Amino acid sequence: MAAFIEFLGSETKVSFDDIHILGHSLGAHVAGFVGNYVSQKLGRITGLDPARPAYETPYLKDTEERLDSTDASFVDVIHTCAGSVGFLRPIGHADFYPNGGTFRQPGCPIFSARTMISENCI
């Protein structure tokens, strides 16, 4: 992906400031790798519930190995499973924790796929 962005920058004169990468879970960290490996600072990266296992637990990975605020001019992160399968600590310029960052959503008291579907929670 980094090589493709470099190609776009050289062949089409796309400004790196205009590039916005969005990634979910492991994809959020992949977006961070891309931001770390391109020759110029990307404009924005959005991390949607960056993966926690192997990145924050059992120990915190170095910033070169995960999404962090140095990967783009602006990094925003939305934490919706913070502390379980998603990163708990803030790692962007702006970190949002809707409903406290937990997977438990209002109106959905029991966490099971069957309940979530029957209660129209997804």
Regions found by a protein language model. Give the residues of each.
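Serine-dependent carboxylesterase/thioesterase catalytic core
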Residues: 1-122
